[in-house]
Amino acid sequence: MDFNLFMQDVVDAARKDITEAGYQELKTEEDVDQALNREGTTLVMVNSTCGCAGGVARPAATNSIHFDKRPDHLVTVFAGQDREATDKARTYFEGFPPSSPSFALLKDGKILTMIERHDIEGFSAMEVTEKLQTLFDQHCEEI
């Protein structure tokens, strides 16, 4: 099997996982500016093809939103795939180095906090879900 075809299947599956969970995919700089400057809270899932993204981060992204409090907006950028959109999103994450997979929580276009790769790798999907839900409890409104 051609490696590029295999990797495209992996990328397509990773995109599908997160968009089927209800996250809006941002593919351009304009998409990012429009989405991240909205009023309210926004969770950005920085997706990737690594094992901890598929085994931990994406399941946590899916499970965490079934909670009394959650962000107003759910969006995703794909590191290594949609580079311009990812780079643009990272300009909003002031004070945090590039990290993927990761989660950024913003309010009214300003970064509140992040769950970085080192907060994901080596943890279970349930542990990362709990980290996200703790942030939602602190910063989000009840739905």
Swiss-Prot record:
Looking up InterPro entries in the UniProt record yields:
BrxB/BrxA
Per its UniProt record, what Pfam families does this chain match? Disulph_isomer
Q: Which GO terms describe its biological process?
A: cell redox homeostasis
UniProt-listed Gene3D superfamilies: Glutaredoxin
PANTHER family linked: BACILLIREDOXIN BRXB (PTHR40052:SF1), UPF0403 PROTEIN YQIW-RELATED (PTHR40052)
Family to which this protein belongs: Belongs to the bacilliredoxin family.
Name of the protein this chain belongs to: Bacilliredoxin OB1863
Q: Which organism is it from?
A: Oceanobacillus iheyensis (strain DSM 14371 / CIP 107618 / JCM 11309 / KCTC 3954 / HTE831)
